[in-house]
Swiss-Prot record:
Zinc finger (FPG-type) in chain: 235-269
Residue numbers binding DNA: 90, 109, 150
Cross-referenced CDD domains: EcFpg-like_N
Catalysed transformations (reactions): Hydrolysis of DNA containing ring-opened 7-methylguanine residues, releasing 2,6-diamino-4-hydroxy-5-(N-methyl)formamidopyrimidine; 2'-deoxyribonucleotide-(2'-deoxyribose 5'-phosphate)-2'-deoxyribonucleotide-DNA = a 3'-end 2'-deoxyribonucleotide-(2,3-dehydro-2,3-deoxyribose 5'-phosphate)-DNA + a 5'-end 5'-phospho-2'-deoxyribonucleoside-DNA + H(+)
Similarity remark: Belongs to the FPG family.
Cofactor: Zn(2+)
Subunit structure: Monomer.
Gene: mutM
InterPro entries, per the entry: DNA_glyclase/AP_lyase_DNA-bd (IPR015886), DNA_glyclase_Znf_dom_DNA_BS (IPR015887), Formamido-pyr_DNA_Glyclase (IPR020629), FPG_cat (IPR012319), MutM-like_N-ter (IPR035937), Ribosomal_uS13-like_H2TH (IPR010979), Znf_DNA_glyclase/AP_lyase (IPR000214), Znf_FPG/IleRS (IPR010663)
Name used for this protein in its record: Formamidopyrimidine-DNA glycosylase
Length: 269
C-alpha cells in the first residue's frame, strides 16, 4: 500500500501540472472503487485547480467550489501524460487538463477512492487523524505521552492513524530498526530517550524515502511512470532470511495484526 512518502511523491509530481490549469472534463471508465466515484467528479467541467495538498495518505485537490479527495488504496498510482495514450485495463480515471496534460489514475485492485466534499473539515475520512509525522507537533515528548499507558506492541501502535498518520507497514518496520527497538516491545516500555530517538528516525526515514521517490515493491509508480527507489535502501522490510546489513544476523519475519513485520533479533531490543 502506498504510504506517506509515496503519496507525497505523487503530490509533488502532479502539482506543477495541475495548479493554474483547468480541468476540462473527467473521464471515468470504472467508478466502482472502494467507494463509488462521487457524482460531482463526473460533472467536472472547466474547473481550475487551485492547489494540490496532502493530509495523511490522502491527496487533496482544491477547486473553487470544493475538494477532490484521492486515496491510492492498495495498488493505486497517478501519472501525468502529455498525450491521450490508450487506456489499459486498470486505468480507471482521467482528468483532462487545459494545458494538454492528463492526470491518469491506475488501480489494479480498485481499493482506492475519488471523493468530493464542499468542506474538508469534518469529512469522515479526514476526521480523528493524528498529527503529521513531519510536523513539529510530532516529537519525542508527544510520543512519550501517547505511549505511556499503551499496553500494546509498538509496531502496530505506530501504524494507528490516531497516533500519527502515514507511517504504514514499511516505514514502521524500517524506523524501529533504525531506532534499535524490537517491534514486540510494549509501547509503554519505551524510555524518554527511546521516544526521542524514534520520533527523530521516523522523520529521517520518511524524508529519505521522499527524496528517493518512495518505495516501489509492486504497483506504485511516480507521476512520471518511474518506480520509487527507496526499495533499494530497505534495511529489514521484505528481507526475511537475508543477512542484516549491520550485523549479519538473518532478518526475521512475524505478523502483527495480520501485517508482516521484519526485524533483526540482534540489533533490536
Amino acid at each position: 500500500m502506498p504510504e506517506l512518502p509515496e503519496v507525497e511523491t505523487s503530490r509533488r509530481g502532479i502539482e506543477p501540472h495541475l495548479v493554474g490549469a483547468t480541468i476540462l472534463h473527467a473521464h471515468i471508465r470504472n467508478g466502482r472503487l472502494r467507494w463509488p466515484v462521487s457524482d460531482e467528479i463526473y460533472r467536472l467541467s472547466d474547473t481550475p485547480v487551485l492547489s494540490v495538498q496532502r493530509r495523511a495518505k490522502y491527496l487533496l485537490l482544491e477547486l473553487p467550489d470544493g475538494w477532490i479527495i484521492i486515496h491510492l488504496g492498495m495498488s493505486g498510482s497517478l501519472r501525468i501524460l502529455s498525450e491521450a495514450l490508450p487506456a489499459e485495463k486498470h486505468d480507471h480515471v482521467d482528468l483532462v487538463m487545459s494545458n494538454g496534460k492528463i492526470l491518469r489514475y491506475t488501480d489494479p485492485r480498485r481499493f482506492g477512492a475519488w471523493l468530493w466534499t464542499k468542506e474538508l473539515e469534518g469529512h469522515n475520512v479526514l476526521a480523528h487523524l493524528g498529527p503529521e509525522p513531519l510536523s513539529d507537533e510530532f516529537n519525542g515528548e508527544y510520543l512519550r505521552q501517547k505511549c505511556a499507558k499503551k499496553k500494546t506492541a509498538i509496531k502496530p501502535w505506530l501504524m494507528d492513524n490516531k497516533l500519527v498518520v502515514g507511517v504504514g507497514n514499511i516505514y514502521a518496520s524500517e524506523s524501529l530498526f533504525a531506532a534499535g527497538i524490537h517491534p514486540d516491545r510494549l509501547a509503554s516500555s519505551l524510555s524518554t530517550e527511546e521516544c526521542d530517538l524514534l520520533a527523530r528516525v521516523i522523520k529521517a526515514v520518511l524524508l529519505r524515502s521522499i527524496e528517493q521517490g518512495g518505495t516501489t515493491l509492486k504497483d506504485f509508480l511516480q507521476s512520471d511512470g518511474k518506480p520509487g527507489y527507496f526499495a533499494q535502501e530497505l534495511q529489514v522490510y521484505g528481507r526475511k532470511g537475508e543477512p542484516c546489513r549491520v550485523c549479519g544476523t538473518p532478518i526475521v519475519a512475524t505478523k502483527h495484526a495480520q501485517r508482516a513485520t521484519f526485524y533483526c533479533r540482534h540489533c533490536q531490543k
